[in-house]
């Protein structure tokens, strides 16, 4: 499998010396647009070079492809109010501002009103406003601005030790001598089921890139700071140091299930991964998606047009009779012997003051989660 970035090149659009004194118009970004701006500029979203124009947006929504035919499954858009849109013209440069600071510039290509109902149905598979992705879609302004961007100021890194651009992770993997790298996306603390599939992958892959998402998530997700501490202690105690690399993914969570699984895989390809783990209900929320829908969607695309190999794992569990982690492929016992693990269940137990057993998560990880969540409650 090629280590080429998606589309064949790594976008590099960080130019801190760009002259902006003559640019007077500005667009206020929200947290999602801000993280998207940086990820476009550092090549995380290659080959996208800006917020999607109408033609690319409609193609992505309808076909999971850019107009060029390159696979891309999540629309990366810049929403503005109708009032702001009325002041903008195609062809002009506009500053991209967040909380009073200019972070970038967009070369406006077009300004258009999206069909958000269609976007919700095709990208999220539902119009239900209780779905956090659909809710956020409709909460954001009504008009989209498309065009190439330039990043002129980097965001402050919440986790500088673990913050890497795709250029840096590629160099890092090469320096470790890794020929094959498997990416793992998570927004939850790593429980025993995660550990099991990660280590199963490591039996045949050179290195694991544990790449937790630390951008905007649902309010009931465990905070990034607590999760990062739990990842550190898990890797220190239970993983071979020379076979794993921890690095943060500063994107917002979309909760788009199958569509987001493709997106997550393509982004990890840009970071230098050759393989990507897709478990049960990847990027799902509630009961909106089938257990393995996020795996099945990969069958809609040819392996060479994705350029990254999905590793599809069945739902793993702790079997009391096997006395270890297993799946239905490796365990013959009845489901009554199985303890089903999930990030949702771990979160529920912690919030109810219950201590998850060692069959759920390592004791060291549980201790970190309990202490961290108690501190957050005190705040």
Curated annotation (Swiss-Prot):
It comes from the Bacteria. Its EC number is 2.7.7.4. Belongs to the sulfate adenylyltransferase family. HAMAP family: Sulf_adenylyltr (MF_00066). InterPro entries: ATP-Sase_PUA-like_dom (IPR025980), PUA-like_sf (IPR015947), Rossmann-like_a/b/a_fold (IPR014729), SO4_adenylyltransferase_pro (IPR020792), Sulfurylase_cat_dom (IPR024951), Sulphate_adenylyltransferase (IPR002650). It catalyses: sulfate + ATP + H(+) = adenosine 5'-phosphosulfate + diphosphate. This is Sulfate adenylyltransferase. GO terms for molecular function: ATP binding; sulfate adenylyltransferase (ATP) activity. Keywords: ATP-binding, Nucleotide-binding, Nucleotidyltransferase, Transferase. One of its GO terms (biological process) is hydrogen sulfide biosynthetic process. Pathway: Sulfur metabolism; hydrogen sulfide biosynthesis; sulfite from sulfate: step 1/3.
């Amino acid at each position: 499998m090629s280590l080429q970035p998606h589309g064949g090149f790594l976008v590099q659009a960080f130019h801190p010396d760009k002259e902006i004194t003559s640019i007077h118009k500005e667009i206020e970004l929200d947290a999602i647009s801000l993280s998207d701006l940086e990820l476009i500029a550092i090549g995380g979203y290659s080959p996208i070079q800006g917020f999607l124009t109408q033609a690319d947006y409609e193609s992505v929504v309808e076909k999971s492809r850019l107009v060029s035919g390159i696979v891309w499954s999540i629309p990366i858009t810049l929403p503005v109010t109708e009032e702001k849109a009325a002041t903008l013209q195609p062809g002009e440069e506009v500053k991209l501002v967040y909380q009073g600071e200019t972070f970038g510039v967009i070369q406006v290509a077009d300004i258009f009103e999206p069909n958000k109902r269609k976007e919700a149905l095709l990208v999220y598979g539902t119009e239900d406003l209780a779905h956090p992705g659909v809710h956020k879609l409709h909460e954001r302004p009504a008009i989209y601005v498309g065009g190439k961007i330039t990043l002129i100021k980097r965001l402050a890194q919440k986790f500088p030790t673990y913050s890497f651009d795709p250029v840096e992770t590629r160099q890092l993997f090469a320096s470790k001598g890794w020929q094959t790298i498997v990416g793992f996306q998570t927004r939850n603390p790593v429980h025993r089921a995660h550990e099991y599939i990660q280590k199963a992958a490591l039996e045949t892959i050179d290195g694991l890139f544990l790449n937790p998402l630390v951008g905007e998530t649902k309010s009931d997700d465990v905070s990034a700071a607590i999760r990062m501490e739990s990842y550190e202690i898990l890797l220190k105690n239970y993983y071979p140091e020379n076979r794993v690399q921890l690095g943060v993914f500063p994107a917002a969570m979309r909760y788009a299930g199958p569509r987001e699984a493709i997106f997550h895989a393509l982004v990890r390809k840009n970071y230098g991964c050759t393989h990507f783990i897709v478990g049960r209900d990847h990027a799902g929320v509630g009961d909106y998606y089938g257990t393995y829908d996020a795996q099945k969607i990969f069958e809609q695309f040819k392996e060479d047009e994705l350029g990254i190999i999905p590793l599809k794992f069945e739902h793993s569990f702790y079997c009391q009779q096997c006395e270890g982690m297993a799946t239905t492929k490796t365990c013959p016992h009845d489901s009554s012997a199985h303890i089903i693990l999930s990030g949702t269940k771990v979160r529920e137990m912690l919030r109810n003051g219950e201590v998850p057993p060692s069959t759920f998560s390592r004791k060291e990880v549980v201790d970190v989660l309990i202490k961290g969540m108690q501190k957050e409650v005190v705040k």
